[in-house]
Amino acid sequence: MSDLVAKTAIDRRLADIVTPVIEGMGFELVRLRLMSGKTRTLQIMADRPDGGIVVDECAEISTAVSAALDVEDPIEENYTLEVSSPGIDRPLTRLKDFDVWTGYEARIETTELIDGRRRFKGELAGTEGDEVLITIEDGRDGYVTIGLKFDWLADAKLILTEELIAEMLRQKKASGNFDESQFDEIEESEGEEADEAEQPPTKH
């Protein structure tokens, strides 16, 4: 089964290199993208298994990943490395994410039309086999829970809600890395990737 961590061939190759490094430090790779542009940017999202990664930890990951990439040298052009947390309205890139975030609202986009639509918004209801379950509004019956095969997904992301913010606060307090000032203006940033811990870019 595929995942949404790394989509393209070069992304998957890079993920194969950096995943052991990140996991060896006690973190998880959430998403990796090599972005095009005048200078290419390697964007890495990482997190603790129980959530709550902070800027200093992103910096540690950046240093370790840089060293590994310097040895393997998979990117021929100059590039900038960015390591960040997934943010509050985080992407859902692995099948297990849909179990972890059961009960929270999400937006899902599929690669092909499913019953005439590609976009689904609703409450996550876990997984069943290789299917993601989501409860969506149904004009006739109120609400209905449908199953979408994980391999059909093009993108999936949590929706910023008060319940989600409360859970992120709980995770940060539990991790011992809680800084209340980071959450002062979250409600004003609804719909954006608020509270994203990010290490300043590193050029290569």
From Swiss-Prot:
Q: Which GO terms describe its biological process?
A: ribosomal small subunit assembly; translation
UniProt keyword annotations, A-Z: Cytoplasm, Ribosome biogenesis
Bias (Acidic residues) ranges: 181-198
Keyword rRNA-binding annotated = no
User: Principal localization?
Assistant: cytoplasm
Protein location = Cytoplasm
Family matches, as InterPro entries: Ribosome_maturation_RimP, RimP_C, RimP_C_sf, RimP_N, RimP_N_sf
Q: Which domain of life is it from?
A: Bacteria
Q: List cellular component terms (GO).
A: cytosol
Spell out the residue ranges making up region: Disordered. Answer: 176-204
Q: Does the keyword Coiled coil apply?
A: no
Entry-linked Pfam families: DUF150_C (PF17384), RimP_N (PF02576)
Task: Please state which protein family the record places this protein in.
Answer: Belongs to the RimP family.
Question: What role is this protein assigned?
Answer: Required for maturation of 30S ribosomal subunits.
Q: Which NCBIfam families match?
A: PRK00092.2-5
List the protein's name: Ribosome maturation factor RimP
| Gene source species | Cereibacter sphaeroides (strain KD131 / KCTC 12085) (Rhodobacter sphaeroides)
